[in-house]
């Protein structure tokens, strides 16, 4: 009977130790997996951030170039507009003078 009790206690102790070892191994594996996942997430985040920075810089460069080109085109258009305005006022002067002359002649006829 004493031998059975000792054997039962020894079996219970071995089971407890094995359970603790198994639990520690599972915990270690979970910790390692978590560390690997965290490292992978950090690497992916860093790569994404770097790609975003490069894309942002490229977009900014394209915007600046487009803005400069647009500004140049506006200046050219503005010059064209000034030339058009000058020619319009030059062309507009003759009809006004003609209308004034007609009004002067009509005024003289009324006298």
Curated annotation (Swiss-Prot):
Propeptide residues per the UniProt entry: 82-111
Keyword Membrane: yes
Annotated signal peptide: 1-19
UniProt entry keywords in alphabetical sequence: Cell wall, Glycoprotein, GPI-anchor, Lipoprotein, Membrane, Secreted, Signal
Subcellular location: Secreted, Cell wall; Membrane
PTM summary: The GPI-anchor is attached to the protein in the endoplasmic reticulum and serves to target the protein to the cell surface. There, the glucosamine-inositol phospholipid moiety is cleaved off and the GPI-modified mannoprotein is covalently attached via its lipidless GPI glycan remnant to the 1,6-beta-glucan of the outer cell wall layer.
InterPro entries named in the record: Synuclein (IPR001058)
Membrane topology: Lipid-anchor; GPI-anchor
Lipid anchor positions (GPI-anchor amidated serine): 81
GO biological process, one term: filamentous growth
Any GO CC annotation of this UniProt entry: extracellular region
Residue ranges, annotated region (Disordered): 71-90
Primary location: secreted
Induction: Expressed under acidic conditions. Expression is positively regulated by HAP43 and NRG1, and repressed by RIM101. Expression is also controlled by SUR7.
Protein's job: Probable cell wall protein required for filamentation at low pH.
Protein name listed in UniProt: Repressed By RIM101 protein 1
Gene: RBR1
């Amino acid at each position: 009977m004493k031998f059975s009790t000792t054997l039962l206690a020894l079996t219970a102790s071995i089971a407890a130790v094995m359970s603790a070892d198994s639990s520690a191994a599972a915990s270690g594996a979970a910790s390692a997996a978590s560390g690997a996942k965290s490292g992978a997430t950090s690497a992916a985040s860093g790569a994404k951030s770097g790609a975003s920075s490069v894309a942002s810089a490229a977009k900014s460069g394209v915007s600046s170039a487009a803005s400069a080109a647009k500004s140049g085109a506006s200046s050219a258009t503005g010059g064209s507009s000034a030339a058009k305005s000058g020619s319009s006022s030059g062309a507009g002067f003759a009809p006004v003078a003609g209308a004034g002359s007609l009004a002067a002649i009509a005024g003289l006829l009324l006298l």
